[in-house]
Amino acid sequence: MAELILEPYAVVQDWHLPGTDVRWESLLSEYLQRIAQRCAASGKCVIGHIKALSTFADQGYLRISVVAANIPASIEGKAPPRCVSLELTLNVLVYGLDRNIVEKITLETASEIARQRKGEVHQKNFPHASDHLFHSNQQNPSKGETQ
């Protein structure tokens, strides 16, 4: 069996959805579940962990986690009442898919969900995200090291 590579993907997304009845827990569960399903449909891969975290001024937080395309998301915490915007940190660990494919899946899925709800989502990549590619027996170009 060929070894599956891991190219971790991390991004910060700013979500804004109009209205006062945004159910972030179910919306973000749907988002992560769709990411997992689309990753699974994109080729031979193993979903390690897809997780998202949003923190709020009242010291609250919302954490969503998915470990397989066919298992419902785990939810911890909740968004404050009448919350229409949030910053979401998303981490996607999927073995066997190129980072660019994962990035495309997350961006397209977020855009679809926001558009369906007449909202918007903008994303900011973490600096140096492309420096963290994990391929066995390949050189890490940012450090000149072999993994």
Predicted feature descriptions by range:
Residues M1-Q147:
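P-loop NTP-binding site
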